[in-house]
């Protein structure tokens, strides 16, 4: 997949089509909450495997049962179709 920067109208659609994600400072971000650390870490492991598949890696933070994920494409300096695809895949993992 060749990444390209999303236009303003595509960014507005993104936050509607992919629930829970917000646009913050040239990136999209979502916070995920779990019952405990083990569930949070299990989620992160599943996300890591998808990230490797796309060769696209998030900035993320784990605080006990909370995981905060931020996505952007550094090489292009903003939010791309690749970030959108990865956010959608991450939501699918969370919804399982």
Curated annotation (Swiss-Prot):
UniProt cross-references to Gene3D superfamilies, sorted A to Z: Transcriptional coactivator/pterin dehydratase
Keywords annotated in UniProt: Lyase
Reaction equation(s) it catalyzes: (4aS,6R)-4a-hydroxy-L-erythro-5,6,7,8-tetrahydrobiopterin = (6R)-L-erythro-6,7-dihydrobiopterin + H2O
EC numbers for this chain: 4.2.1.96
GO molecular function: 4-alpha-hydroxytetrahydrobiopterin dehydratase activity
Signal peptide: none
Keyword rRNA processing: no
Keyword Chloroplast: no
Enzyme class, broadest EC rank: lyase
Any single biological process term in GO: tetrahydrobiopterin biosynthetic process
Top-level taxon of origin: Bacteria
Family in the record: Belongs to the pterin-4-alpha-carbinolamine dehydratase family.
Protein name in the entry: Putative pterin-4-alpha-carbinolamine dehydratase
């Amino acid at each position: 997949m060749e990444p390209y920067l999303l236009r303003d109208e595509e960014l507005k659609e993104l936050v509607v089509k992919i629930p829970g994600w917000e646009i913050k400072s040239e990136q999209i971000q979502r916070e995920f909450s779990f019952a405990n650390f083990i569930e949070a870490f299990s989620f992160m492991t599943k996300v890591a495997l998808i990230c490797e598949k796309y060769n696209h890696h998030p900035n993320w933070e784990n605080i006990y049962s909370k995981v905060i994920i931020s996505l952007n494409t550094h090489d292009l300096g903003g939010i791309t179709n690749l970030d959108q695809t990865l956010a959608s895949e991450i939501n699918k993992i969370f919804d399982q």
